[in-house]
Design a protein with these regions (language model features):
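Surface-exposed, charge/polar-rich loops and edge strands
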Residues: 1-415
Length: 415
């Protein structure tokens, strides 16, 4: 059963939240962060992308960069740009994208739940990325950014959230970079806090939607602090890390598409012939064509869109991995025909997240940068949960969640 707790959030005053809040650290590079921060000294990028305070080209892994993050976090608090709440609260966070709003509960998730598998993952993590995030957590003694969880739909929590959503939020703004709405409510009522804690305690599992490296880093630092504390009792703040938990049915998973630089020595016709072994191939013409259902793919090649429908027998409906379109495309197109065996390291392939649309696939091929593009039907939350429950791991680059969590609305200190 899942254990969560309220915590004393560190957060901006109402009048500063729009200046401080930012996109997450991993959706933009250092130079993009430098441009977005501009001359805004209050931008959270000075804490989560502190290399922007050094000469361009400074490595984000430079020891001075981590130290700068800690110095800036301290300075933000000293200047009153970030203040810690007096009491332990939960928080309700709403995101609005294209007229649709989803509501998450900001909680302290239990480190032991991650270590024992109650918090379920569906992606492999890389040790170098874990270590980077661990250094950031250690030096700040805080989870500056939350991780993104899904939980099974719950009518009690849904009713509680709706009650708060009908009241005036603590924060309410539209982010200038993406046009998405962000709102936050503080749950300080003791009875409501008890309800949230007890409802989570009934849940057999929580699911990481996005933020596998942040989750691993937070849990590993928590375990490290417990091991190094001779007076460890188990109720210390480092036993918890900050997560925003959304009902699974509210979440939108977008398509995560592929662009490839060459056809592995094949002509276009040879490539299409090779695909016909496992797919029904239909030329859809020059107008952009989006996959309409599971096991249908859209190929963009030589100015034309093709529908590729996987033939019966090319996938196993009873295998939670083998039935995924990301697996089918990796096995039968990228590996078998194009010779791309490692999606993480092969320089011939790149990935385009769903919000950028199929127009971006067309642009990258038409420009000559890429030879072909492949659009996939989005993975469903049910598929993600089935895989996590089975203890298996999704293929790389399978899920793209939008909207991304806004960073800087709430921060969790570990002591």
């Amino acid at each position: 059963m899942a254990t969560v707790k309220p915590f004393r959030g560190v957060r901006p005053p109402q009048d500063l939240v729009e200046e401080i809040a930012s996109r997450p650290y991993d959706v933009l590079d250092s130079e993009e962060a430098r441009v977005e921060a501009g001359d805004n000294e209050k931008s959270l990028y000075h804490i989560i992308k502190p290399e922007i305070d050094f000469e361009p080209g400074t490595s984000e892994y430079d020891p001075r960069v981590y130290e700068k993050a800690a110095a800036n976090f301290k300075m933000f608090q000293e200047k009153g740009w970030l203040r810690q709440d007096a009491d332990e609260n939960y928080y309700i966070y709403a995101q609005t994208m294209n007229g649709k709003t989803q509501y998450g509960l900001v909680v302290g998730a239990f480190v032991n739940d991650y270590l024992d598998g109650t918090i379920k993952k569906h992606e492999l993590t890389r040790r170098d990325k874990e270590e980077d995030r661990m250094k950031h957590v250690r030096v700040n003694d805080a989870n500056i950014e939350p991780v993104f969880f899904a939980y099974p739909d719950n009518e009690v929590l849904d009713a509680l959230i709706k009650r708060y959503a009908a009241t005036k939020p603590e924060y309410d703004f539209v982010a200038p970079d993406d046009g998405f709405g962000h709102q936050l409510w503080v749950v300080s009522d003791k009875a409501d806090i008890d309800v949230i804690t007890k409802e989570f305690a009934k849940m057999p599992a929580l699911y990481i939607a996005d933020g596998h490296h942040r989750s691993a880093a937070a849990a590993l630092v928590g375990a490290e602090k417990a091991k190094n504390n001779p007076n460890h009792k188990g109720d210390e703040e480092y036993n918890y890390f900050m997560a925003v938990c959304f009902q699974a049915s509210q979440l939108t998973v977008l398509d995560y598409n592929r662009v490839v630089k060459d056809l592995n020595g094949l002509t276009s016709e040879q490539f299409l012939d090779a695909l016909r072994e496992n797919f029904e191939v239909e030329d859809k013409g020059e107008a952009i064509y989006k996959p309409q259902h599971l096991h249908e793919f859209s190929l963009y090649l030589d100015g034309h869109w093709f529908a590729l429908n996987a033939k019966q027998g090319t996938y196993d409906d009873y295998d939670p991995i083998g039935v995924l379109d990301v697996d089918i495309s990796s096995r039968l197109i990228l590996d078998k025909v194009l010779g791309i065996t490692d999606l993480r390291s092969d320089k011939r392939i790149d990935f385009v997240g769903g919000l950028r649309g199929l127009e971006e696939l067309k642009r990258r091929v038409d420009s000559g940068e890429m030879r072909m593009a492949l659009a996939l039907y989005p993975v469903s939350m049910k598929q993600i949960i089935d895989i996590a429950d089975s203890g298996k791991i999704m293929p790389p680059k399978a899920t793209w969640f939008e909207p991304k969590l806004r960073s800087g609305l709430v921060i969790h200190k570990l002591s």
